């Protein structure tokens, strides 16, 4: 965590020369070299098109909170033109999409009500006085993607006589050694160093799983394959994938996506472990794999039962027949299983599904009896509302343990706080200085994320559009070398990533 006020402006001048803060050996293209077509109107935007890319010329709307579109009329927005949002007094919050590379001179000049700006990690150049006169803007996070930012871009306004004044205590969040960092130095602003961001994403859940695999493995003998439209088998399979040093990839029921096929080819894998029965991954899909990968029946293994409870048991039995620890999670909630999957993998502990109340599934009950005397400690993830005390007393008894002593509950007030409590209780499992973020209300982009965080030995943070008090408190106590994000900006928006960075700065 770094917060510094430099001793003198002249010291800063010695560090960087010229009117713009530019990274060494980085040259930003000049948008003045583009000859655009005549302006066209789409909704509140006037825009021009050059070489298939959109330049926003003027915004005519009155929105207070605005996310600038990444595309207009099917063409990507690449440039926010000079003075495009000038004097937009209604604007209080704006998000600039990752499609944008250039924020031109005076783009948001004198947006006097603007308090919050999210600059996505596609932006490379920020022009002169782009945010001049935004007196209510007290801080900004300049991402590491920005290679050129003019000295007078942020933190200045003029009085009635035209005298330039500085916004009091203006603060820049930036990565060390970046253009934003040098901009803070040259302007003698306070600054705080944030971790770099690594976003691992594809165009869909299958491509994201393949991208996570590629990030983790240069090659692999084995691949674990799970159904991509459900979470139960995939998340129960994270400890197995970690044990086998295998990526976890996803498929449809009857057709294996090209992204998955291509990743298996890249890995050179010759063994595929299928999670779940033919109701989720059919023989038709297996035959496709055989044909396209030139494999035979001997290259496949299926771990399955008639339900998610039974499949989780089959996976557990194969992964570790003699577990000393075990995790219970609610069968109908992906969040808790996702939160604990990497921890379970690191501890070589199976993930077993339970209902909220009632009787324990017969297959699960038989499994618990089979590991009775082996399991010394078990953990139930989530509060009494997801797995009741009554159910836990039954599960503990089946293991020959006592709920409240050798079987303990790890829970917060909601899925986000439960995830935080997991990270605190099992902090010893995390040796990495990294942290990963996944969407809390949906599972697709993060299904394979558990294997990544297990291999990298990093905690998982579940969040959506904001951070609650428990998450902010957790982040403030820690520094991270990298923040990894699972999925695109539609799953985990840049505004949320920035909140994580700022909370831990």
Task: State each model region's role.
Residues 2-27:
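Sec-dependent N-terminal signal peptides of Gram-positive bacterial secreted proteins and lipoproteins
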Residues 19-41:
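Sec-dependent signal peptide cleavage junction
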Residues 21-24, 44-52, 61-79, 89-102, ...:
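Structural signature of tandem-repeat unit edges
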Residues 55-56:
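Conserved functional micro-motifs across diverse proteins
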Residues 132, 140-175, 213-224, 320-325, ...:
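Long, low-complexity, intrinsically disordered polar/charged segments
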Residues 181-186, 287-288:
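Short loop/helix-cap segments at secondary-structure boundaries that form the rim of catalytic
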Residues 193-505:
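Extracellular glycan-binding segments that recognize GlcNAc-based cell-wall polysaccharides
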